[in-house]
Amino acid sequence: PIAGSMVLAAILLKLGGYGIIRMMQVLPTTKTDMFLPFIVLALWGAVLANLTCLQQTDLKSLIAYSSISHMGLVVATIIIQTPWGLSGAMALMIAHGFTSSALFCLANTTYERTHTRILILTRGFHNILPMATTWWLLANLMNIAIPPTMNFTGELLISSSLFNWCPTTIILLGLSMLITACYSLHMLLSTQMGPTPLNSQTEPTHSREHLLMVLHLAPLMMISMKPELII
């Protein structure tokens, strides 16, 4: 059920990050290199999750692995226990909660019309559902974390805090962000561009679907304009 995936990606996955934030308050500070293996493991896990996204053919699985990769960045920056790192983790968790839930919602609207989640079989919607393509574009751009979205603010704070703590981490961090952009654009092009399948009767988008997307993306845009609300 898509509702379960939306709640899982938007709320339950972020509760794990919140639990780590609370737990780190009782652990020693990271002035030593004691937590370096855990940070490298979290960043390497994010890179591997991103690489897994690149070879996915199932739309829902791709979005799920995307959520895992973003949580790897969150865990890495929480461990170093800096004010910028915690602010970036909070910003990215909230922003990606909206973004991943919106992507799952869009995946469900596509599945309702094509009855498949295979990427290559869901192409060609930009010709017949241009408004849905616009929602896909906005959600993917936010997943890539372009400025001035809250996703960009969170990743900028995370990058700055990790680089200041250990400059070598920028290699894994930069690789993760590069692969994120690659699979997000691949997902957009695979589901929206290309020829429309022949003999396919596609229902137009409904008002409830547009309302769902507005309720996902409008709060994220408003938070992006006033980030003081959460950081």
From Swiss-Prot:
Pfam families: Proton_antipo_M (PF00361). The keyword Chloroplast does not apply. Its EC number is 7.1.1.2. GO terms for biological process: ATP synthesis coupled electron transport; electron transport coupled proton transport. It comes from the Eukaryota. The chain crosses the membrane at residues 1-21, 34-54, 63-85, 89-111, 128-148, 169-189. The keyword Ligase does not apply. It catalyses: a ubiquinone + NADH + 5 H(+)(in) = a ubiquinol + NAD(+) + 4 H(+)(out). It is a multi-pass membrane protein. Belongs to the complex I subunit 4 family. This is NADH-ubiquinone oxidoreductase chain 4. The gene is MT-ND4.
